[in-house]
């Protein structure tokens, strides 16, 4: 079956000149042909993601066209404006895939609003809402290595597509022949027919205004003298982040030169992920050279941001996603109360795998904190619920431990642009009162306890990877562990049982241990890996770290 599909591809006059030579190179290599053609990339709520190359199990123009035809079939049943917003990041062929998607939509009579240059996830979410679109498409593979690309699909609210809608689109994709079942005109024809238009300056300006309206202490950054090092990690963050920082008065910014401009090969780091040290290393070195107060790095699609803070002894320390989430929550709450801008009955939303320290901080400020499943769409879902009740202004902040933050309802996905603005404003504020981010973080730990949150990952590559992951998760359910690292399990929460959790079904297990530590086990939604999340609480960092190490060691044989 897969051999036949391979031969069909080989017989085509393929429009992408890279694909035929690639197919010829694997001739006779059964394992390689099977990997590329035995299955197709699956379309889920996060859309598509895969390695670039020829085949149904790879990202290429034909897979993008087929996916877009499936999306178009769904859009045509939705009424409304019959419009889709499209954007893309700096990855290899992102601009090509975005134009291919626009061309297929136009061939189906659907209007398109596409950015004329790369713009990040939050800008796509905003444009989807601004133009009252039926859907949005963002061409990106987020922080994956350079060989990957992807295709994120958004619903009319600017939130990642719902499970139900994604299932319909996937069914339509499966019914569509990858070569003969797709309607197609050229991008130029779509423009000529008036079906494809570029996103206007009015939309871009409204996006920046919506972000800048969420300053906690407007004008403060202009006079604080904050010194910043910033890296867009060769992605799409450069223009929007620098625009907003300049607008709020953060002007002493040094950009990491090797990572300034878009480059989908990500030559300075193999994994452009602001969670890891290697991606931030150049920025950290530059921060030390320039004696910066703060270093920021946004990922390629600028929906996540990592930071390093200057410590009193002049060294720099990476701040985790959980710590930044708690710092921003604390800063937003304290600042809004001080300025009289806190709404009545404010709501904060975090994922179930994010730190319980946020619960303690929210309680201190009298803020309702809601915990939702992993994936920012669930935070967007909470905002949508508030909006439906006419209470959208109650939402003040949402975050995930994986470095994603949002501080307003203007978009429905994580936004590294507003996060960068608020982190800089927060740093400027603490600088202006003779404090620092580091000092405030230590004060928070002193007040609430020394929480430690760590994430480990176990990778399962290849065609059998997903089966191995499923087998491990089933094994944990069939034979529940009674202890980890000598700590007895006091409670198991299985999120596949919505009747017990009150949340939609999800493949997540949470183990509560004696003493209050927790271990979370869940397969990644976008990569072939199982993630383990540890939360430990000690009298100091060393005690919390020692417990985490014990727990992690005990899990290795279970997940190997």
Which residue stretches match the model-derived regions?
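Gly/Ser/Thr-enriched, mixed-charge loops and adjacent short helices
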Residues: 32-37, 41, 149-279, 286-287
């Amino acid at each position: 079956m897969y051999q036949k599909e391979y031969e069909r591809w080989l017989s085509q006059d393929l429009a992408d000149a890279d694909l035929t030579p690639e197919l010829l190179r694997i001739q006779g290599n059964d394992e390689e042909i099977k990997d590329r053609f035995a299955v197709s990339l699956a379309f889920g709520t996060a859309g598509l993601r895969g390695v670039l190359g020829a085949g149904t199990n790879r990202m290429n123009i034909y897979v993008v066209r087929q996916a877009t035809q499936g999306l178009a079939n769904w859009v045509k049943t939705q009424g409304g404006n019959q419009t889709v917003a499209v954007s893309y990041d700096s990855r290899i062929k992102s601009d090509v895939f975005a134009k291919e998607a626009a061309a297929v939509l136009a061939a189906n009579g659907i209007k398109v609003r596409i950015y004329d240059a790369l713009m990040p996830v939050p800008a796509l979410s905003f444009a989807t809402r601004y133009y009252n679109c039926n859907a949005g498409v963002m061409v990106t593979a987020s922080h994956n290595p350079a060989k990957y690309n992807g295709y994120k699909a958004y619903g009319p609210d600017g939130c990642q597509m719902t499970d139900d809608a994604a299932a319909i689109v996937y069914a339509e994709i499966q019914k569509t022949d990858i070569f003969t079942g797709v309607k197609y005109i050229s991008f130029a024809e779509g423009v000529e027919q008036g079906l494809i238009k570029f996103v206007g300056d009015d939309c871009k300006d409204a996006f920046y205004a919506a972000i800048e309206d969420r300053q906690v202490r407007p004008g403060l950054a202009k006079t604080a003298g904050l010194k910043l090092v910033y890296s867009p990690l060769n992605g799409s963050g450069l223009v929007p982040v620098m625009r907003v920082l300049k607008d709020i008065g953060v002007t002493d910014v040094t950009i990491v030169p090797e990572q300034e401009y878009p480059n989908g090969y990500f030559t300075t780091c193999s994994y452009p992920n602001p969670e890891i040290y290697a991606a931030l290393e150049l920025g950290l070195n530059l921060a030390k050279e320039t004696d910066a107060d703060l270093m920021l790095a946004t990922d390629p699609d600028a929906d996540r941001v990592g930071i390093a803070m200057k410590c009193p002894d002049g060294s720099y320390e990476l701040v985790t996603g959980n710590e930044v989430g708690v710092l921003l929550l604390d800063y937003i709450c304290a600042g809004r109360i001080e300025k009289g801008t806190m709404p009545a009955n404010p709501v904060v939303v975090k994922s179930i795998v994010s730190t319980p320290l946020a619960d303690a901080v929210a309680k201190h400020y009298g803020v309702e904190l809601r915990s939702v499943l992993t994936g920012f769409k669930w935070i967007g879902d909470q905002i949508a619920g508030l909006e439906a009740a006419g209470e959208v202004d109650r939402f003040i902040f949402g975050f995930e431990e994986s470095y994603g933050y949002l501080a307003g309802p203007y978009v429905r996905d994580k936004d590294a642009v507003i996060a960068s603005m608020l982190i800089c404003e927060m740093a400027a504020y603490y600088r202006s009162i003779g404090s620092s981010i580091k000092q405030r973080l230590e004060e928070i730990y002193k007040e609430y306890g020394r929480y430690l949150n760590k994430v480990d990952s176990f990778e399962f590559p290849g065609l059998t990877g997903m089966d191995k992951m499923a087998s491990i998760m089933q094994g944990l359910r069939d034979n529940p562990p009674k202890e980890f690292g000598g700590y007895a399990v006091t409670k198991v929460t299985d999120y596949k049982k919505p009747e017990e959790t009150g949340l939609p079904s999800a493949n997540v297990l949470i183990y509560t241990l004696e003493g209050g530590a927790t271990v979370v086990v869940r397969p990644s939604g976008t990569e072939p890996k199982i993630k383990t999340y540890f939360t430990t609480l000690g009298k100091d960092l060393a005690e919390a770290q020692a417990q985490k190490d014990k727990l992690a060691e005990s899990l290795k044989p279970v997940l190997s």
